[in-house]
Structure formats: C-alpha cells, structure tokens
Amino acid sequence: MRKFAYCKVVLATSLIWVLLDMFLLLYFSECNKCDEKKERGLPAGDVLEPVQKPHEGPGEMGKPVVIPKEDQEKMKEMFKINQFNLMASEMIALNRSLPDVRLEGCKTKVYPDNLPTTSVVIVFHNEAWSTLLRTVHSVINRSPRHMIEEIVLVDDASERDFLKRPLESYVKKLKVPVHVIRMEQRSGLIRARLKGAAVSKGQVITFLDAHCECTVGWLEPLLARIKHDRRTVVCPIIDVISDDTFEYMAGSDMTYGGFNWKLNFRWYPVPQREMDRRKGDRTLPVRTPTMAGGLFSIDRDYFQEIGTYDAGMDIWGGENLEISFRIWQCGGTLEIVTCSHVGHVFRKATPYTFPGGTGQIINKNNRRLAEVWMDEFKNFFYIISPGVTKVDYGDISSRVGLRHKLQCKPFSWYLENIYPDSQIPRHYFSLGEIRNVETNQCLDNMARKENEKVGIFNCHGMGGNQVFSYTANKEIRTDDLCLDVSKLNGPVTMLKCHHLKGNQLWEYDPVKLTLQHVNSNQCLDKATEEDSQVPSIRDCNGSRSQQWLLRNVTLPEIF
C-alpha cells in the first residue's frame, strides 16, 4: 500500500511539471508574437534591442517589401504624404536587420578605443514615425554606446500630432539620451541644424537626415579620421533605400562629389589620380571636391572655426557646396570614408513647400556662395543661370570677412588642386552662343541628356541652354557634355567629355568661320529639312550655312 501511495505522488508531481512546462511554452510563444507586433507598430513603450540575427519579417536584411494587389490603391494614396512608400515603411520593424555591405578589407580594420564622442543631429519636418524612429534606432543599435554623447532631434515646426508628445514620451525610454528641440517657426534645414549644433555637447557633430539607416561599423571609421586630423570633415558612403520598396542597396565606393555649371551637386567617377594617391586601396578614404550635404561628421570646434553654415542662406540648397568650397579653400580636407555606410531614402520629389518657391530660395543661396567663394568663375554660373542675378541675396559682408580672416585660397586654386577634372574649363576661347551665319539660329542643348542629339533653335540671347564653351582643348562643351561625332554625316551627339580629343576634337577657323570635326574632316552645318531641330555635319563646302559665330556672353551689370 505504502509503495502504491508513493507511486501516485511521483505521477502527480510529474504531471504538474508537464502542465507547467506546457503553460510556459505557450506563454512565451504568445509574448514573442506580441513583441513582433510592438516592433512593427506605431508608438511603443519598449526599447528595441539590437537585432542579433536576421528576422523573417518584411524588409529584413534590406530586402524589398512587396505590397499585395488589394492594397495598391491605398499604398498610392499614402505615398503622397511623404513622397515615399509609407505603407511599406510601416510594415518594416523599427530595428530591422541590414546586410553588411562593407568591403572585405573594412571588416578587419581595428580602430582606437579613445575615439571622440559625437552628438547626432537629425532635423525633421512632418517626417513619418517609422522612418524617423528607424533612423534613431539604427544609430543606437549600430554604434558603440560610449561614442554616442546624445541624439538631438530638431523639429522644424512639424504639424503632425504624433511628432509632439508621443515622440517625446517614446525617446525618453531609449538607452541613449535623446533630446527633442522645437523650432518656433518653419526655419529650414540650415537654421535648424545650426540650432541642433548649438545645443549639442559631443566633441564631434554628426548630421543625418531623418530617413536614414546606419549599418554595422558606420561610426568608428568616421570618428577615427577626425581623431587623426580635426580639420578633416568626413562623409559615409550613402547607400540607397528605395522610396518605392525600401530595399537597401549598397552605394559605390567608386564615385565622389562634384558639381555642374548650374551648381547642382553631381556624382562622378573617382578619377585615376585619386586611385593612384591611395595606391589602389579602396578601403582608404576618398578626397572629394564636394559633399552631398545630408550626412557628415565634423569636429565641433572646427565647425565653429570655419564659420558653421552661412546663416544668411534660406531653408536648404547650395549649403553643401558652400561648406565644401570653404573647407577646401580654408585649409581643411573633405573625405568620403569608404568603410562607413549609411542608407538614405532618395525621393523623386519633395513633399514640402516653401514661401516663394524652392527655385527662388536656391537661386539666393547659390548667389551668396558664388559671390563669396567663386571669384571670377562665378561668371559661368551667371551666364548659365542669368535669373540668379536678379535675386536679392542679402548682406554677405560677414562671410567675405570670414574668408579674409581665415586667409582662404582663391577658387582657381581649388579648381587646379582639388577639382582639376571640374566641368568648368579654366582655359577657353569662347563662352557663349554659337550662332549660324545663314539661319541666325544657335546651338541649343534643349535640356537634353547624355547620348542625345544637340539641338539648334532661334537665338534668344539669355544664356542658359544656348551657352557653349569652345575650350583650349578644342572641345565644344555644354556643362559636362561635349559635342561628339562617331561616324560620317553624324549625328552630332552630346557625350561625357573624355579629354582624349578623338571624336570630340573640333577646329575653329576664325577667318572662314567654320567648325571642322577633325576625325571626320567634315564641317558643322545648319539643320536639314528632314530634322529642323538638330544641326547636321557634312563635307566642307565653304557655304554660309557652315559658318558659325562664337560669341562671348557678357552680363555688364555684374562684371
């Protein structure tokens, strides 16, 4: 009997433990599901920890999000709110996993322990909750904790309620100090960044846009370069986050920043001279003439010494070239650190409006940078964009004084030493219209792109698309495109200038007024009846239709 009672006790105890195990298993399974929902939702109280292994949810490891057919119409409506696929963004975890897109040589680099601390300044205006918080979480989760002094979120007068108290409540619970600073009125990126920089405390200031994702190892190589030389300003490689699917695509380490005649920032291939300077080691930083401006790190004291941003500029536009010129001309160095990768949502259109329109604002900002930093080379810009000369660009005396105080070099030095492959030719025979003697029409790039035919149109004398440079290298150039003929009788197309002469070599005879294409031995001619909007190229015959006047454009009110 005693033995039977003992067996019953053992069985009962075992049954209790089995039931308890089943309960715990079910409980934690449900908790995991709840956590997953919290990660993907809107405001949540829990702090999201770094992802240790790839999840299987939408967008994990940077994969594209596919929206079901039945949700396509709703997706299109939501797209208009921020000019990116908001539905896709809200499906993705705030701490999603990303691939390690660094070069193999970058993954084994070792950095000093005593790197400077940084304050990360992020300006936002009516930003989506998911993209803003994904930016914040990527900074926290993929940065050594002791290197992040704080994150400063600068609200440029947002109107959306969830960016008010809910945002403040959320960031208070994060394991890195996050401060929300409010601009009293819509001030624009430039002044909002200045506000964020002024309240920040880190030894380095890192500026990011509000729709970024930092990848593993992004911060250390940036801070290491600044520790090596505090006058070095550094940018990560900017990877592309699709505005349509939020797919994460690695950017190239073989491009760097430049600009065209209209002072638009452009990406161009890293020249061979820069590859030679680095002895072919692609893990070494690239010296870049300009930066895109959205993402960079700079020593706090150096930022003050070189004049921060030009506070006379409005909203955004041109500030990236202005600070790029200033860094180089005033003794600093600007680099793209190829071992640092940060993703950025590139939008095809801006969702924001500005008083007076973006064109007027950018014209004012570009006029200020041209007047202060470009010396006589501002002529190129004004001839291409004559409307700029009519804008009120304010008082620039303090910025001119800054240039003198810092003993900055002339813009010609910048072109010769930092950007010798600039689209601005330093030596040329003419800059202006190329007019046909018989028809009185002018060559016109028609705002066409590379590989398209050059046009011809009635001369309007307003510069812009009818400005061509006949360079000392005997190229006929419009911005970074050169007139190119690859076969007899044309067509005459616009291709990237390669400086190798060949199909882009033209001989102008100032007596006969002919433009002879050297390779084909044919002459530029007026348009044909078959195509009245493009010039032709034919055997030279001395006719008036093959005579061209190369006229320099001047703007007496400026020069």
UniProtKB/Swiss-Prot annotation:
One cellular-component annotation, GO: membrane
Region Catalytic subdomain B: start-end pairs: 285-347
Domain Ricin B-type lectin: 429-551
Binding-site list for Mn(2+): D209, H211, H344
A GO molecular function held by the record: carbohydrate binding
Residues the record marks as carrying a glycan: N95, N552
Stretches assigned to the Cytoplasmic side: 1-8
Keyword list, A-Z: Disulfide bond, Glycoprotein, Glycosyltransferase, Golgi apparatus, Lectin, Manganese, Membrane, Metal-binding, Secreted, Signal-anchor, Transferase, Transmembrane, Transmembrane helix
Disulfide topology: C106-C339, C330-C408, C442-C459, C482-C497, C523-C540
Tissue: Widely expressed. Expressed in all tissues tested.
Keyword Secreted part of the UniProt annotation: yes
Residue span of region Disordered: 45-65
Protein name: Polypeptide N-acetylgalactosaminyltransferase 1
Organism: Homo sapiens (Human)
